[in-house]
Amino acid sequence: RQSMPGMMDTILNLGLNDQAVEGLAKKTNNPRFAYDCYRRFIQMYSDVVMELGKSFFEERIDAMKERKGVKQDVELDANDLKELVKEFKQIYLEKQGEEFPQDPKEQLIGAVKAVFRSWDNPRANVYRKMNEIPYEWGTAVNVQQMAFGNSGMRSGTGVAFTRDPATGAKKLMGEYLI
């Protein structure tokens, strides 16, 4: 079977909620990191699972940076990110008519459905046609423990493939960001 790297939607930090974010802040001794993860999760869940888009959230981030006189997200502190979490949850409430889900099981079910739904997104359809991947094959959903790429100067993120994503050639390749 062929892979479709980068075609299916992804939701990071699933399971975070108002209680878990406090536990993450305590465990890592880094409230800024914990609230950054939570605001990213709310944004991704709202976009991928609920299909609200990213613009509402990006506007709030930009407004916060302007208020604080900073240029980059990384310059926002823990209190700024806590405020963004409140604002993001308010956007969710206004757009969905319900509170952001606090139950990790509910979050997981929504995320799994969204990944299956992403099999039919335009990007995936074009990729399948270009690579002659039958629609009937469907897709799988992977759920795995989070490996944080934003927890400080000694963390990063990356992806590895056993095939060249562009050609399908059998060779190990990947990329990373620090």
What is each stretch, according to the model?
Residues 1-178:
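Nucleotide/phosphate-binding sheet-loop regions of phosphoryl- and nucleotidyl-transfer enzymes
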